[in-house]
Amino acid sequence: MTRSYQIRTYGCQMNVHDSERLAGMLEDAGYVRAGTDVDPDVVVFNTCAVRENADNRLYGNLGHLRPAKDRNPGMQIAVGGCLAQKDRGEIVKRAPWVDVVFGTHNLGSLPTLLERARHNEEAEVEILESLDVFPSTLPARRESAYSGWVSVSVGCNNTCTFCIVPALRGKEKDRRPGEILSEVQALVSEGVLEVTLLGQNVNAYGVEFGDRFAFGKLLRSCGEIEGLERVRFTSPHPRDFTDDVIAAMAETPNVCHQLHMPLQSGSDRVLKQMRRSYRSQRYLDILRKVREAMPDAAITTDIIVGFPGETEEDFEATMQVVREARFASAFTFQYSKRPGTPAAEMEGQLPKEVVQQRYDRLIELQNQISWDVGKELVGRSVELLVAEGEGRKDTETHRLSGRARDGRLVHFTPVGAVDGQVRPGDVVHTTITRAAPHHLVADSEITAHRRTRAGDHWEEGVRPKTSGVSLGLPSFGAPPAQPAAQQGCAC
């Protein structure tokens, strides 16, 4: 009898993409995706360990599943991802109804571990300390018909004092340029219009094979792939953000003028305590160069409020950088103490009420800036890649949603001849009529509508399914010279 599965994903884009790999492996092993109205035979939690409430969220959700497990002993529950890598066997101690625990380094073991647990009728816990196989070797069931994630590396060599990710995902491992471009080409061949290049520190790409200009070259090579309309990347580190990457962004037509670059703090003293290896002026200088090369660039960031020892003066320095940077938007976080990180042991842990008050002030400032920046775009014509389910009120307002080339979310009204014809994955042109802090609105006429293969696939329920690229871990040393190829690999 065919068994069904459901994957619940928490955390960053890396986890979202890892879940696509998990789905691809399960389907290759004969599982089918569970419908929304049935209990799955296998539930997989792909977890995050970055925020303090990650533990509570996981164990709360596991508790909610226990009655279903009691009713159906054949149901299996698996826990993977960063929290599994951290907590290991503690998970089955706290939730003994869990069947499988696997980490960030052995995604490919999941089908085997499920079968072993079912056969042995006991929990299987397998956590590796380094990569078993590179994730790109695993098949993937893609979630989107029009947009795809492509990892350029896994792991991180930075030692930020607040971050537990390097301890859980390991040192940086880079894929070879040809492997990356082959995966991008495979996605485009399936109708995908947009790819996002992923890495914990994406612009450090090339460190493993000694080419500090490798990421800029990779962007330019993506520009040679016919049919690839949009290229994005996340997340870069200011320390490694070089002028050649700015030039590649500005000079490669399909690379989007969008930059998400974490600031974390505007205080040089706090940045030093965070081990961020840049200072606020260096950060602002990068933004200046980006805007000189691409005046239309949308720049977003991450900011942590309430890092241990942060003074009112430190916080005001962050507010000043935010005023100068004029971010299109910012992901703001209250500092979360994570056991196992140096920051967790630092003196000067701030009272919750102080952190909350500063957080509220930062949110108020950034919302106003986002709104002001958005209002400058009213009257501008934009090209939108129509997206699925990004507008919470789309059903009520009869609007659809899409992403502009700079990544901004735009809600638009498909009236007239295109009413009922526009699908996720299609491309439309319209004009911005109104701005809000977190989105733009285009209630004007649709001036152009292009139906795409991606839209056809969305309508048919077809999603790309890519096989693994290459075998084993990437080799060390410089990559071999790439022959002239259709995808224009010049790395």
Curated annotation (Swiss-Prot):
Catalytic activity, EC: 2.8.4.3
Record domain MTTase N-terminal: where: 3-119
Location of this chain's protein in the cell: Cytoplasm
GO cellular component, one term: cytosol
PROSITE patterns registered for this protein in UniProt: MTTASE_N, MTTASE_RADICAL, RADICAL_SAM, TRAM
Binding positions ([4Fe-4S] cluster 2): C156, C160, C163
Keyword tags: 4Fe-4S, Cytoplasm, Iron, Iron-sulfur, Metal-binding, S-adenosyl-L-methionine, Transferase, tRNA processing
Location of the TRAM domain: 375-446
Superkingdom to which the source organism belongs: Bacteria
Amino acids binding [4Fe-4S] cluster 1: C12, C48, C82
Cofactor: [4Fe-4S] cluster
This protein's record includes keyword Transferase: yes
Domain Radical SAM core: 142-372
Details of cofactor binding: Binds 2 [4Fe-4S] clusters. One cluster is coordinated with 3 cysteines and an exchangeable S-adenosyl-L-methionine.
Reaction(s) catalysed (UniProt annotation): N(6)-dimethylallyladenosine(37) in tRNA + (sulfur carrier)-SH + AH2 + 2 S-adenosyl-L-methionine = 2-methylsulfanyl-N(6)-dimethylallyladenosine(37) in tRNA + (sulfur carrier)-H + 5'-deoxyadenosine + L-methionine + A + S-adenosyl-L-homocysteine + 2 H(+)
Record GO terms (molecular function): 4 iron, 4 sulfur cluster binding; metal ion binding; N6-isopentenyladenosine methylthiotransferase activity
InterPro entries the UniProt entry points to: Elp3/MiaA/NifB-like_rSAM (IPR006638), Methylthiotransferase (IPR005839), Methylthiotransferase_CS (IPR020612), Methylthiotransferase_N (IPR013848), Methylthiotransferase_N_sf (IPR038135), MiaB_methiolase (IPR006463), rSAM (IPR007197), rSAM_horseshoe (IPR023404)
Family recorded in the similarity comment: Belongs to the methylthiotransferase family. MiaB subfamily.
Cross-referenced HAMAP family: tRNA_metthiotr_MiaB (MF_01864)
Oligomer and partners: Monomer.
Protein name per its UniProtKB record: tRNA-2-methylthio-N(6)-dimethylallyladenosine synthase
Organism (species): Saccharopolyspora erythraea (strain ATCC 11635 / DSM 40517 / JCM 4748 / NBRC 13426 / NCIMB 8594 / NRRL 2338)
